[in-house]
Amino acid sequence: MNKASSEQVVQKVITNRKFNQVKVDTSNANIKVKQGNHYRVLFEGRHKLLPKVEVKNKQLIVEDKDGIKVVNGNLFDLFKKHSVVPQITIELPDEKLKNIEIDDSNGSVTVQGIAVSQGEIDLSNDNIMVDHSTADGYDLDTSNGHVEINGSNKGDSYSKNDKARRVLSIDNSNGDITVSYGG
């Protein structure tokens, strides 16, 4: 058994302070933002990948510790039989999020049950899903994937009212973008 597969996987509540904005900058994690009963950030993954988390001026900031970017890979484990992709779950009881910024290299991003009025999501490899956007405009682009808006395939890009004050901008290199919104 290699060292990576024998490392302890932890489940930990990192913070429970109140916030209305989210800023995430990680290199390797699945990110999920959802409605919950409390303000909190949950982490599940290898202890050494535990992110730095703080709340400043009601903005939740989640980032790799000490700015170190960790590549979740192993040359001898090409099919990822032993890898554990960290899961960061951000919960808030309010149904509205003032702003969201996520920059993640490898991992999925899911925003579920939270109204997102504006923000920026930049992902290199995996899928992005925002299920309840209240933005005034959209600028969505993927290099290798599809953009789906309210169940309709829009090809590899979608733009609507992208000069508005509250715009949701999503850029993905390899993966699909799925957004639902009213109106």
Regions from the PLM with identified roles:
Residues 13-14, 90-91, 159-160:
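Beta-sandwich interaction modules
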Residues 11-12, 22, 51, 88, ...:
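Residue-level detector of beta-strand structural context in well-folded domains
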Residues 26, 64, 94, 104, ...:
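Flexible glycine-/small-residue-rich
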Residues 70-132:
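Non-cytosolic head/periplasmic domains of membrane-anchored proteins
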Residues 27, 54-58, 105, 124, ...:
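Structural motif
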Residues 2-65, 111-113, 129-132, 176-183:
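Short linear S-[DN]-x-LW-Φ motif typified by the pepsin-like aspartic protease active-site region
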Residues 17, 45-46, 83, 95, ...:
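Short solvent-exposed loop/turn micro-motifs enriched in small/polar/acidic residues
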Residues 80, 111-183:
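Short, surface-exposed interaction patches in beta-rich subdomains
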